[in-house]
Amino acid sequence: MNIMIVEDDYVIAKDLQSIAEAAGHRSVGPLQTMEQALAYAATADIALVDLKLADGPTGASLGRKLIDRFRLEVIYVTGRPEGVGAGLDGASEVVMKPFSEEQVAAAIVRPSGMPPAMTGFDNRILCF
């Protein structure tokens, strides 16, 4: 599968890219903005999307566009759980930062049509 990585933090983007490629997938990106992601969306099957990108908190809006326009599976990868509520609609999965390789790999292979899961919430204390 072609996995589009939309993440403005270079180190995190490269980690996601390495995880996807180690699992046998091809990576598209990393991309840092909504505009870049929309330009490459037709080449992807799944999108790993951060909620806060280089062009602002556009990840949730981007995710909805990728689902509606391109029928992509969207997996949010975020350290901002408070931003997930509005953008979760339609997403396949939410993976919390910091993430493990296993969490990301499991999110990528989870079958479409299953209820969205929020990976990483079970072992973290969240403060608002």
Where are these regions (language model features)?
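Conserved acidic carboxylate
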Residues: 7, 78
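Acidic, metal-coordinating helix/loop segments flanking the phosphotransfer/catalytic sites
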Residues: 30-46, 54
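Conserved phosphotransfer microenvironments
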Residues: 50-67
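C-terminal output helix
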Residues: 95, 99-127
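His-Asp phosphorelay/catalytic-motif detector in bacterial-type signaling
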Residues: 69-75
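As written
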Residues: 87-96
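Two-component/phosphorelay signaling modules centered on CheY-like receiver
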Residues: 9-29
